[in-house]
């Protein structure tokens, strides 16, 4: 516990102090620049947000040494980062969102990576605030309220100046064995395909995304994330402790124009993809890899390392000058203030770690199962919205 604290507190100081500086700059740009030019604000914010998010990329790449192996054909891999894309992914681990950031960073669009998330995420210190300034979409999981919020948020992206990814975790919550068992019981009672490795997708958000972005988003990236049997599952706590893991990601590209037109058909297409995803994961379990799939080299760029070293130098020099000026350690009052500051940083880190834990994620609300109605493919167990966290 002492060792963990000795690691987490310095990383927390670096992340939260630099993050507050980024948030302040984002707020100033939001107030002064966005009313005059939304595109200029977006271009500036893209660079500014990336300087913060690259710190978490550094933790994955350099501090913990997590290895992310990507399986995709050359055509798909070469398209990534060059076009707007809707990213649909299973929600397998506590750091799926960070895996997405790694892939976006490698593709050159980390600063314009977006996601649909639950509303409470935007209140997370520093990281949630940066997401709000970056136009992430936050939902309340109440479709009566979220339908219009999601529609307006999606349509607002039509004039985005750089290629963006919008991530949508249509399972609605992170995968756990307990949630899988509940999904299997529901599927059996509703005469649906019984899932083995995924949860039943909730399709309202996906249908809304396709319907509202079809005209300006050309591609859907179907990502399948899993952890090989030989690797421990990655968590935020393991990352901060510097403990490595391995993550396998399979990516398949679908053309948006090939999707059906009607809402019911779009929903069924999404369910069919998750049936196929389930079968793909069966093959992965048997082989501990994605057999017959081409592995792409995503490397480990030094950009995140350079950003972290730059932040560390700036903050260290700033701290030395501040401590010399304020003479905090020359009195009990100063020592108390310093201890309080460290306590707040530690608390914020704990909030970030706990918010990422899959066993603490809130399961989607489920209404009692009803007899299957072939004329209404939106199953009765589906929640009103999708969420990311």
Curated annotation (Swiss-Prot):
Pathway: Phospholipid metabolism; CDP-diacylglycerol biosynthesis; CDP-diacylglycerol from sn-glycerol 3-phosphate: step 2/3. It catalyses: a 1-acyl-sn-glycero-3-phosphate + an acyl-CoA = a 1,2-diacyl-sn-glycero-3-phosphate + CoA. Its EC number is 2.3.1.51. Residues 370-389 have a biased composition (Basic and acidic residues). It is found in: Endoplasmic reticulum membrane. The chain crosses the membrane at residues 2-22, 305-325, 333-353. InterPro entries: Acyltransf_C, Plipid/glycerol_acylTrfase. It comes from the Eukaryota. The keyword rRNA processing does not apply. Interacts with GPAT9 and DGAT1. Belongs to the 1-acyl-sn-glycerol-3-phosphate acyltransferase family. Converts lysophosphatidic acid (LPA) into phosphatidic acid by incorporating acyl moiety at the 2 position. Has preference for C-18-CoA substrates compared to C-16-CoA substrates. Required for female but not male gametophyte development. The HXXXXD motif is essential for acyltransferase activity and may constitute the binding site for the phosphate moiety of the glycerol-3-phosphate. This is 1-acyl-sn-glycerol-3-phosphate acyltransferase 2.
């Amino acid at each position: 516990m002492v060792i963990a604290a000795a690691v987490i507190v310095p990383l927390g100081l670096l992340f939260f102090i630099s993050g507050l500086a980024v948030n302040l700059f984002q707020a100033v740009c939001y107030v002064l620049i966005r009313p005059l030019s939304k595109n200029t604000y977006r271009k500036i914010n893209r660079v500014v947000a990336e300087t913060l998010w690259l710190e978490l990329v550094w933790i994955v790449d350099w501090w913990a040494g997590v290895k992310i192996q990507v399986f995709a054909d050359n055509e798909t891999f070469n398209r990534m980062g060059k076009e707007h894309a809707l990213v649909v992914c299973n929600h397998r681990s506590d750091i799926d969102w960070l895996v997405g950031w790694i892939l976006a960073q490698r593709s050159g669009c980390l600063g314009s990576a977006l996601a649909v998330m639950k509303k409470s995420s935007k209140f997370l210190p520093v990281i949630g605030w940066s997401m709000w300034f970056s136009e992430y979409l936050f939902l309340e999981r109440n479709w009566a309220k979220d339908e219009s919020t999601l529609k307006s948020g999606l349509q607002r992206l039509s004039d985005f100046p750089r290629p963006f990814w919008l991530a949508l975790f249509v399972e609605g919550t992170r995968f756990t064995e307990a949630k899988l068992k509940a999904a299997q019981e529901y599927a059996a009672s509703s005469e649906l395909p019984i899932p083995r490795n995924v949860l039943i997708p909730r399709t309202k958000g996906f249908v809304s995304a396709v319907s509202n972005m079809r005209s300006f988003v050309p591609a859907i990236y179907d990502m399948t994330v899993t952890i090989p049997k030989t690797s421990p599952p990655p968590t935020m706590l393991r990352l901060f402790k510097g403990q490595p893991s391995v993550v396998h990601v399979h990516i398949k590209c679908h053309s948006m124009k090939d999707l059906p037109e009607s809402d019911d058909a779009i929903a069924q297409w999404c369910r069919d993809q998750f049936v196929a995803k389930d079968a793909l994961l069966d093959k992965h379990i048997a082989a501990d890899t994605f057999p017959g799939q081409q592995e792409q080299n995503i490397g480990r760029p030094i950009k995140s390392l350079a950003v972290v070293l730059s932040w560390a130098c700036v903050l260290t020099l700033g701290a030395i000058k501040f401590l010399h000026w304020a003479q905090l350690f020359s009195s009990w009052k100063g020592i108390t203030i310093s201890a309080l500051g460290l306590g707040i940083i530690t608390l914020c880190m704990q909030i970030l770690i706990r918010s990422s834990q899959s066993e603490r994620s809130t399961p989607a609300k489920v209404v009692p199962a009803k007899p299957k109605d072939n004329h209404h493919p939106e199953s009765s167990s589906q929640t009103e919205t999708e969420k990311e966290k």
